[in-house]
Amino acid sequence: MDNKIIDLFSGAGGLTTGFHLAGFESLCAIDQNKKALQTYHHNYPNAKVICDDIRNIKPSDLRSLLNLKIGELAVIIGGTPCQGFSRNVPAEYRYLEDPRNQLYQNFLEFIEEFRPRYVVIENVPEILRAYQGKVKYEIFGKLEKLGYRVNAKSLNASHYGVPQIRSRAFFIASLEHLLQFPEPTHSKDYQHKNDQQLELFSGYLSPITTVREAIGDLPPLEAGQSYELGDYPEPYQNHYQKILRHKNKKITNHIARQLSSIQLARVRLLKEGQDARNLPADLAPKKYYSGAYGRLFWEQPAKTITRWVFHPGSGRFFHPSQDRVISIREAARLHSYPDTFHFLGTYTEMASQIGESVPPLLARVIAEAILRAF
């Protein structure tokens, strides 16, 4: 089964989608979020989905259910829950005994049972230095004891074509040889060159993908409006839009959240790139996060898309020029989900599915690094 994967802690399927784009096929996904798994199953109907806490599943029972021999599976992937490591959690609430911080150990039990050729574990960058590196070295030690050669690194999604500044840590392990992480393909320091120069220069880095390149072709909306199953209003404008549209015919999930009267008053006063700091005193919130009530910049990548992307007070989530927060489809575009990927659930559930997942194009470069080692 050279191209088969199992996705643990799958969520809606960001990691799986990246591996799917690289040519892998999902056998099974496990997550305890029912709505996220419904989204996963809708997009990957041939994969078996199991809605349960991974701690309730015996690895040997799962291997028997999937009729797999030890060593037969190509890759086990998974983004273990990260809230217990995240810097967004106050330091006094981060501790090693937090149950969320122990789930990587359950992940490793599945590795021991299945012995896949390759392993990919994703988490927040803080996991690499959490508790004086104890977690990192425990993961290395366990995998090395099982015969794997392990590498770990934090990658910025914007350096691999994703129009979003988002850093994630990856552990990649192989039973055969030490895998190297892919080199960046995009850089904010890129200097534009004319076509003749490009033909002469190999190994150049492309410019970082911007918000305009990601969402500029989608039809305008007002707060509270949606554009479902409609046609694209114009042809794709760039390579990013081309690859995300792929063979998709109708736009889905282009839904803008309704705003309160004070939120509307705030956004109508803000220009592109401005935020709460630019609001008059009578409209400025008393307390706010950095970038809160901020409009995105057209010619820059987005800041990190979180599960709170629907709430303008939680970050820079206002559209660059329209008086609303970005739609679900726009958030998905900024996260590099193809337009063929359809999200299910309420507005907030869909926002969470995007914000808590791995950007597919970032996952794809990891998958392609594994393919090159096959």
Mark where each language-model region is.
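C-terminal target-recognition/interaction regions appended to catalytic cores
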Residues: G230-F374
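Proline-centered helix-kink/hinge sites
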Residues: P45, T80-P81, P116, P163, ...
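Short connector loops/turns at beta-strand edges and beta->alpha or beta->beta junctions
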Residues: P81-F85, E176, F310-H311, D339-T340
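Class I S-adenosyl-L-methionine
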Residues: L65-I70, Q83-L283
